[in-house]
Amino acid sequence: MNDFPWLTIIVVFPISAGSLMLFLPHRGNKVNKWYTICICILELLLTTYAFCYNFKMDDPLIQLSEDYKWINFLDFYWRMGIDGLSIGTILLTGFITTLATLAAFPVTRDSKLFHFLMLAMYSGQIGSFSSRDLLLFFIMWELELIPVYLLLSMWGGKKRLYSATKFILYTAGSSIFLLIGVLGISLYGSNEPTLNLELLANQSYPVTLEILFYIGFLIAFAVKSPIIPLHTWLPDTHGEAHYSTCMLLAGILLKMGAYGLVRINMELLPHAHSMFSPWLMVVGTIQIIYAASTSPGQRNLKKRIAYSSVSHMGFIIIGISSITDPGLNGAILQIISHGFIGAALFFLAGTSYDRIRLVYLDEMGGMAISIPKIFTMFTILSMASLALPGMSGFVAELIVFFGIITSQKYFLISKILIIFVMAIGMILTPIYLLSMSRQMFYGYKLINVKNFSFFDSGPRELFLSISILLPIIGIGIYPDFVLSLASDKVESILSNYFYG
């Protein structure tokens, strides 16, 4: 037990401070914006301080743990704790949310509610990553959905209500399976029902029951990740949402699904995961090819980037399915890497939209001359997305490849086939990313069109782009910074498997 409740403060602070914002005097939007940014920066500094001085890298066990009785009647505890698996995602959440609030400066309608919802989402996401109790994990998982739905339905494109409804139907529907899995796994086995993740990790189940639990959790996390064919909400949602919301969706929300797969499916249900991993490997491989093939056919700029996210999530699924040290480390690195890259691409797509008010690629063209700074940043981050050496995406995908090669679970011929198909996916990635850049920035379409006022990125946008680019290059040059956080935890998870 930790003496000081660091994690409780980190989880509760954003939503509590955000609630106070609702009582601020109506003095325009600037007060709300700066207040929210100050809260996010303070929260990020607090999180960094707590982790720097209290987190031990070489300890795979739960740290900063807190355990308070909450509801006596249900024997329900407020259990918090972090390990190598959650520390990276929590810091990523803080970083991306802070930048997303800065990106939301152009939002003027219902500014107070918009910023409060962003802070409520922040609390829900950190709560999900630091929960050590299954029911608390479920509550945080659901808490985070409500702000996302409201952000989608109130701020966005013309079809925002359709995309928000589709999002909530998918995610709320999958949450039913998550709740059934949580209740089933906690009530089975011991005489006393338990929701403590540490105790559940040592529990064993009959094979049929474990498979049923696994399928329930897999459906819930497959929608969030997303894994095909449960991905169709994502392009619509990204296509209509405001770009600051897109940053949070691509940077953090999708990573919650991958985190759940490792934290619950892999850690609590190792036998079922061992049985399902070949199928997940096949799905992940198909996903890379499918999304990379579908992306070039998208006219909408943000939908094309959304399909690139689906393709990149395929590498995470393959890494998790390899059940090897490099594979799982590569998947965790890809979670962090794509969090930065996805958020950056959506931000730059949004800044381009702010200038030309066009969403369809075939209507764009010739913007490179007018907005050279945005063009430069977009090109660099497109290169990061297609895994250029020296960028974080390259290292993550390379380590996932090593994970497949070293896996003891698969035959040589199947490993060669998987690597071959993944390589085709990696060849298709530059095709849709570079053609996207060509359609936006090259050619002559918009140069001679009247009533288009082009102005290049200002200090705020340039600062934001560089802030996301620096960690991408930093992780690409020195990936051990992220890998060292999770390596001991990865080994302890894989110790439940007979190979790897």
UniProtKB/Swiss-Prot annotation:
Compartments, record wording: Plastid, Chloroplast thylakoid membrane
GO-annotated cellular components: chloroplast thylakoid membrane
Gene Ontology biological process terms from the UniProt entry: ATP synthesis coupled electron transport; electron transport coupled proton transport
Entry EC no(s): 7.1.1.-
Superkingdom of source: Eukaryota
Transmembrane intervals: 4-24, 35-55, 87-107, 113-130, 134-154, 167-187, 211-231, 242-262, 272-292, 305-325, 330-350, 386-406, 416-436, 462-482
Enzyme class name: translocase
Primary localisation category: plastid
Entry keywords, A to Z: Chloroplast, Membrane, NAD, NADP, Plastid, Plastoquinone, Quinone, Thylakoid, Translocase, Transmembrane, Transmembrane helix
Catalytic activity: a plastoquinone + NADH + (n+1) H(+)(in) = a plastoquinol + NAD(+) + n H(+)(out); a plastoquinone + NADPH + (n+1) H(+)(in) = a plastoquinol + NADP(+) + n H(+)(out)
Keyword Plastid in annotation: yes
Membrane-topology annotation of the record: Multi-pass membrane protein
InterPro entries: NADH_Q_OxRdtase_chain4 (IPR022997), NADH_Q_OxRdtase_chainM/4 (IPR010227), NADH_UbQ_OxRdtase (IPR003918), ND/Mrp_TM (IPR001750)
One Gene Ontology term of the molecular function aspect: NADH dehydrogenase (ubiquinone) activity
Similarity comment: Belongs to the complex I subunit 4 family.
PANTHER family membership: NAD(P)H-QUINONE OXIDOREDUCTASE CHAIN 4, CHLOROPLASTIC, NADH-UBIQUINONE OXIDOREDUCTASE CHAIN 4
Protein name: NAD(P)H-quinone oxidoreductase chain 4, chloroplastic
Protein species of origin: Nasturtium officinale
